[in-house]
Amino acid sequence: DVTIFESGAIVEYVLSRHGGGRMRPSPDSADFPSYLQWLHYAEGMIMPPVNTIVVETILLPPERRNDENVNRATKLLSRMLQAVDAHMEGREYIAGEFSGADIMTGHACTVSKRLGADVSDKPNVEAYIERCNARPALKKAWTV
């Protein structure tokens, strides 16, 4: 039995052990560096401000919430999503075909929007979220 508790590590482990070469570019592919970058960008750059927003607006009791923390996190999240928007210009998925990087980044973008991040000025992010969420497996996962 194996226990892994970080989502990026879980995605890498599952794809390495059970992916059969699917859902990630091969290491010699031109898409592989982008795949790695965005696989880790989701948890390293998008999710920290998301987590701050969750803590400050949902988890903390009202008397302990700090609006300034939410404002800073919201601004940071907008910048992080702007980078995704720029990368997604002319692309359907992060690194060519749908991959583990899209599992991570698509989820981070979706959660950001569901928490109220304004993506109306980020049309590539908006379209990317819609594409990811239109995938049958993800539709099924959201119902569990």
Question: Where do the protein language model's features map onto the residues?
Answer:
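Residue-level signal for nonpolar/aromatic packing positions in well-ordered secondary structure
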Residues: 10, 84, 102-103, 132-135
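Hydrophobic alpha-helical bundle segments that form small-molecule/ligand-binding pockets
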Residues: 81-95
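Alpha-helix C-capping/helix-to-loop hinge sites
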Residues: 17, 21, 61, 90-91, ...
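GST-like domain detector, emphasizing the conserved glutathione-binding G-site
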Residues: 1-68, 75-78, 85
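Long hydrophobic alpha-helical segments typical of transmembrane helices together
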Residues: 124-144
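Alpha-helical packing segments of well-folded alpha/beta enzyme cores
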Residues: 73-80, 128
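Active-site rim elements
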Residues: 67-74, 92, 115-118
